[in-house]
UniProtKB/Swiss-Prot annotation:
Belongs to the nitroreductase family. HadB/RutE subfamily. Its EC number is 1.-.-.-. This is Putative NADH dehydrogenase/NAD(P)H nitroreductase HadB. It comes from the Bacteria. InterPro entries: Nitroreductase, Nitroreductase-like, Nitroreductase_HadB/RutE, RutE-like.
Length: 196
């Protein structure tokens, strides 16, 4: 990716999508998204995000069975739906990902540290999910993030027998501008921020 990306592309002009054009998203584009998002910062480079790119009809039907009724159409019609998950055992990879501190794995290991590890995985996996959205927009795709689904059902369908848990799902493709709602208001700086 060599193009200069504007803030408007990433934020101001980008919209959450409700419908999709019939345009393919090649595997190479998904790899490009990951190869950019992986460089976003995470705590001790823990990189807990695990992503399933759902694109086959069979996999979409499996996912559609676990989403809220309002999201079924969005799942079935998106060229790709990313299931953004996080690995609660992310720390098993820390010797590889954070090699300058040999003790780093011990910060998260053991039953007494399970809550800390879970919080770390969820927080940093969420960050990486946001990086996925920014990377997808940067390479010219639109996004439709969704949280209206049954996490336990998605985990059973896609992550059974693993230590990965679902966080949110996100349609990826070329959005149908006719299906986008008018932009909703946002909070002003003074409403959301404090200078201390």
């Amino acid at each position: 990716m060599t193009a200069t990306i504007s803030l408007a592309t990433l934020f101001g002009e980008a919209r959450s999508q409700n419908g999709w054009l019939d345009r393919d998203v090649p595997d190479a584009r998904l790899r490009e998204i990951y190869d950019q998002m992986k460089f976003g910062p995470t705590s001790v480079n823990c990189s807990p995000a695990r992503i399933v790119f759902v694109r086959s009809m069979e996999a979409k039907q499996k996912l559609a069975g676990a989403v809220a009724p309002a999201n079924v159409d969005k799942v079935m019609n998106a060229p790709v739906v990313a299931i953004v998950g996080y690995d609660t055992r992310f720390y098993d990879r820390l010797p590889e990902l954070f090699p300058h501190n040999p003790a780093v794995k011990s910060w998260f290991e053991g039953p007494e540290k399970a809550a800390f590890a879970e919080t770390t995985a969820f927080r940093n996996g969420t960050l990486q999910g946001a990086y996925l959205i920014m990377a997808a927009r940067a390479v010219g795709l639109d996004c439709g993030p969704m949280s209206g689904f049954n996490n336990a059902a998605v985990d059973a369908a896609f992550f059974a027998g693993t230590t990965i848990r679902s966080n949110f799902i996100c349609g990826l493709g070329h959005g149908d501008p006719g299906r986008v709602f008018p932009r909703s208001p946002r909070l002003a700086f003074e409403q959301a921020c404090t200078l201390a």
